[in-house]
Design a protein with these regions (language model features):
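N-terminal glycine-rich, Lys/His-bearing helix-loop that initiates the first secondary-structure elements
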Residues: 1-12
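Conserved PLP-enzyme active-site core in the AAT-like
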Residues: 8-9, 30, 48, 58-256
Length: 256
């Protein structure tokens, strides 16, 4: 039933695995077999408590993270230069944003990350903030002192959320900036399709501490995700995980 020109261009393999949900291939919303195992392998690769496949890209993952951590009427500290998905997550959760300014590079005319001192000052001024979200690395590839920020945030016993869209590779090489999970961020998401080998829109969410309820993350993802996720796309995410876990250091050394 596939268009002939499209079939000639793509070949038959993508369509052989483009199936709907049934027992043999598992289901993303209540994974019990191969998807469950794939997510566990991702968690093992990154050294975290729990990993989730995010089929709506990092935009959907960011919305899920915010909705999992803060409730309606609660305050969340975010940079001014956030992606629109952060604004969407705040709207959907009913949370109240408290904004902090990133560092501005006057020479390049771009925004960098936030300084640890900025985070500390804002938390001192707003004692009722329930979570902090930062971008690291930034959309321009600039990393901040995420370890110091994590320490400051955790001194208030609140979760640190990290938009690590451009950093799914950081964990796999010691010469790269510190990754969110290695800094102790409580939850982060990554665009596996941007930097690693997954197909477009495939991302990962990592839960890294008890400050975030992994069961709630699963529930929120079930609210946001399609009930017909693409198996070719999910397979590409699993294979990207395998590649970076097995060959990541070698590939990154060559690149660096």
């Amino acid at each position: 039933g596939v268009d002939e020109e499209f079939l000639e261009f793509m070949g038959t393999n993508p369509f052989k695995i483009d199936v709907t949900i049934f027992k043999m291939v598992d289901g993303l919303h209540h994974p019990k077999s191969c998807i469950k195992e794939a997510q566990e392998l991702a968690a093992d690769a990154y050294g975290v408590k729990k990993s989730f496949f995010a089929v709506n890209g990092t935009s959907g993952a960011i919305q899920a993270m915010i909705m999992s951590v803060v409730k309606s009427g609660e305050k969340i500290l975010v940079p001014r230069n956030v992606h629109k998905s952060v604004s969407a997550g705040i709207i959907l959760s009913g949370a109240i944003p408290v904004y902090m300014n990133p560092e501005i590079d006057e020479e390049l005319g771009i925004a960098h990350g936030v300084r640890p001192s900025t985070v500390e000052k804002m938390l001192e001024q707003h004692s009722d903030i329930k979570a902090v979200l930062i971008i690291n690395p930034t959309y321009y590839g600039v990393a901040t002192d995420i370890q110091k920020i994590a320490n400051i945030v955790h001194s208030y016993d609140i979760p640190l959320i990290v938009d690590e869209a451009h950093g799914p590779h950081l964990h796999f090489h010691e010469d790269l900036p510190l990754s969110a999970v290695d800094a102790g961020a409580d939850i982060c998401c990554q665009s596996t399709h941007k930097i690693l080998g997954a197909m477009t829109q495939m991302s990962l969410i990592h839960v890294n501490s008890n400050r975030v309820d992994a069961n709630r993350v699963q529930q929120i993802l079930s609210l946001l995700h399609t009930t017909s996720p693409s198996y070719p796309l999910m397979a590409s995410l699993d294979c990207a995980r395998r590649q970076i876990a097995i060959h990541g250091r070698e590939l990154l050394t060559r690149t660096i």
